[in-house]
């Protein structure tokens, strides 16, 4: 509860949840691979109480969401619950964030529906293969590859996913049946058949949405509980906090109770979830082939059918989970290990496939509940996992009465925050060009998810390459021409730099001396060295000088190693300008050949 979070604030910011420091020593290396060893020795009874409350709160949120997300994935409802518990146990041992909860999410469920054709066997196999890919990325420390997906691309995808998922639940909210799943067909048929709306489902769905909104607003405005408050005030605020935190479970239970009340009267105005397979899932290897009425689909054919999903699903799963982990680590003042997170997510999906789970990742909503509940360690996930298992074993018969419109309300309210309207205004104000990859991703994701992500990433990459090939330069006109590249120099930029130098210094009458100010150049490659050598020759032919200023040690070392004819450099711009204003034939100002040789020997030995 809020008071406990405050009381444990210092312990939570300095103890568990911190990624162990990378060290070659055996204990540190073991802690890095098994983060539980870093916080378990100092585990306390106070942390146990906080973790229990947080785990219970997350569990009451996870169960109705799991049922709802299975609908988004196009799978029977029990598969949502099958996917909701394995991450709790794996992350207990391997996670580096105390706040993150792994399980089914709206975005993962949407991707699963795209690539598994609503077939549980495909979904389970996709979880296994995604886990293998994610685990391999963690072992090979390939987490840096995620940095090539820019923030506008991620925002474009999540916004499109929010629209797709939210609109996809309108049919359940209104009680419409036999609506096709492809987005554009879904929009067309929903409006075409709007007159077929079932009043009972629509009213119940809207009431559930209103209740969820009111409870969320109450949750956001519940004042923190302080120990000095009177017991009655603390109790009342604690009850409000508990009720608003478990709002999904309360609303779904309310809707199920209403539906059951109608059922006993013999009249049912709602479309119900229906039968849910009872009991715990069997432990078995993922299906590497599927037998249908038309024959057996081999493993190779299943992989071919999933196609781009084998890249998109593991990639987006990692992006979503690490983004959530980093956000809460920054908020709560601790660090995570991104590569260790890859291992945790990968192993979760691999082991989850043994219990019929579809791909999972970090959930922003449930992680927020976890953090706000005052969780102290990943042990809170154990309570959540046990609660999900108990619901599978004892409550599945009650899920029959949950109206689909109530689950649709839960999904719509969960994905609404994913559509970030502020990002469009922010990018318009900060850098309008970044709207291009965002809009490309957003629009194309309505066609095919992989095309949207690929096109957005490609546009971002082209923008990056263009800035590398055409770096901005600052030019100072004076007695001596000074040209300063605003960023580093690499081989794509050399031709553009050469053209600008020639046009400003040598293709004018009379030719002018030039100082190349290289303060912002941190490194150069061999192509740049060759280009600079050619420029030095061009300047010598015209009888003017090209001097270098502000060379950093790595750059100077490379240029001295190349033995460029006519190469001269100065420590300050004033020295270079004073030298270049002298008559031809004089020695460089404040620099001698022997000092160049001494510096060259010293740099090459460094």
Curated annotation (Swiss-Prot):
Residues 470-584 form the STAS domain. Residues 1-51, 95-100, 141-147, 219-250, 329-341, 396-398, 463-606 are extracellular. The chain crosses the membrane at residues 52-72, 74-94, 101-117, 120-140, 148-168, 198-218, 251-271, 308-328, 342-362, 375-395, 399-419, 442-462. The gene is SLC26A11. Gene3D superfamilies: STAS domain. It comes from the Eukaryota. This is Sodium-independent sulfate anion transporter. Detected in all tissues tested with highest expression observed in brain, kidney, HEVEC and placenta and lowest in pancreas, skeletal muscle, liver, lung and heart. Its main location: membrane. Residues 73, 118-119, 169-197, 272-307, 363-374, 420-441 are cytoplasmic. It is found in: Cell membrane; Lysosome membrane; Apical cell membrane; Basolateral cell membrane. InterPro entries: S04_transporter_CS, SLC26A/SulP_dom, SLC26A/SulP_fam, STAS_dom, STAS_dom_sf. One of its GO terms (molecular function) is chloride channel activity. It is a multi-pass membrane protein.
């Amino acid at each position: 509860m809020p008071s406990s979070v405050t009381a444990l604030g210092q312990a939570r910011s300095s103890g568990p949840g911190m990624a162990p420091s990378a060290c070659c020593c055996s204990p540190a290396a073991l802690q890095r691979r098994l983060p539980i060893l870093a916080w378990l020795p100092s585990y306390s009874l106070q942390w146990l109480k906080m973790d229990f409350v947080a785990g219970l709160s997350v569990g009451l949120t996870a169960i109705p969401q799991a049922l709802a997300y299975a609908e988004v994935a196009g799978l029977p409802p029990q598969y949502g619950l099958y996917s909701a518990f394995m991450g709790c146990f794996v992350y207990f041992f391997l996670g580096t964030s105390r706040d993150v909860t792994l399980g089914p999410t709206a975005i993962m469920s949407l991707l699963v529906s795209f690539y598994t054709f609503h077939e549980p066997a495909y979904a389970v196999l996709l979880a296994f293969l995604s886990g293998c890919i994610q685990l391999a990325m963690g072992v090979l420390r390939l987490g840096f590859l995620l940095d090539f997906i820019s923030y506008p691309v991620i925002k474009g995808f999540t916004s499109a996913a929010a629209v797709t998922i939210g609109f996809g639940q309108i049919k359940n909210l209104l009680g419409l049946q036999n609506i096709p799943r492809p987005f554009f067909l879904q929009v067309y048929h929903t409006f075409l058949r709007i007159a077929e709306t079932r009043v009972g489902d629509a009213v119940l769905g809207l009431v559930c949405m209103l209740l969820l909104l009111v409870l969320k607003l109450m949750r956001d405005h519940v004042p923190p509980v302080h120990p000095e408050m009177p017991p009655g005030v603390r109790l009342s605020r604690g009850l409000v906090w508990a009720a608003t935190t478990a709002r999904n479970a309360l609303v779904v239970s309310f809707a199920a109770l209403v539906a059951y009340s109608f059922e006993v009267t013999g009249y049912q105005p709602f479309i119900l979830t229906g039968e849910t397979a009872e009991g715990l899932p069997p432990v078995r290897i993922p299906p590497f082939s599927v037998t249908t009425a038309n024959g057996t689909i081999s493993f190779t054919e299943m992989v071919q059918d999933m196609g781009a999903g084998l890249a998109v699903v593991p990639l987006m799963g990692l992006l979503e989970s690490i983004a959530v982990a980093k956000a809460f680590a920054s908020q709560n003042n601790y660090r995570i290990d991104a590569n260790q997170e890859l291992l945790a997510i990968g192993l979760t999906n691999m082991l989850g496939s043994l219990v019929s789970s579809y791909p999972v990742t970090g959930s922003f909503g449930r992680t927020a509940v976890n953090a706000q509940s005052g969780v102290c360690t990943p042990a809170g996930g154990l309570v959540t996992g046990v609660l999900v298992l108990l619901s599978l074993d004892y409550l599945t018969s009650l899920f029959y009465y949950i109206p689909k419109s109530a689950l649709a309300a839960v999904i719509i309210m969960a994905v609404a925050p994913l559509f970030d309207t502020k990002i469009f205004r922010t990018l318009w104000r900060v850098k309008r060009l970044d709207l291009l990859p965002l809009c490309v991703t957003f629009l194309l994701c309505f066609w095919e998810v992989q095309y949207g992500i690929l096109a957005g990433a490609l546009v971002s990459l082209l923008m990056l390459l263009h800035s590398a090939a055409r770096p901005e330069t600052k030019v100072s006109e004076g007695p001596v021409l000074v040209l300063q590249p605003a960023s580093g120099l690499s081989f794509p930029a050399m031709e553009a730099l050469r053209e600008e130098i020639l046009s400003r210094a040598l293709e004018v009458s009379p030719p002018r001396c030039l100082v190349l100010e290289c303060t912002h150049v941190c490194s150069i490659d061999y192509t740049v060295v060759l280009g600079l050598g050619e420029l030095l020759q061009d300047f010598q032919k015209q009888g003017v000088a090209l001097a270098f200023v502000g060379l950093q040690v790595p750059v100077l070392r490379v240029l001295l190693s190349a033995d460029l004819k006519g190469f001269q450099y100065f420590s300050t711009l004033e020295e270079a300008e004073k030298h270049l204003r002298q008559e031809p034939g004089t020695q460089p100002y404040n620099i001698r050949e022997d000092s160049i040789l001494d510096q060259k020997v010293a740099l090459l030995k460094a």
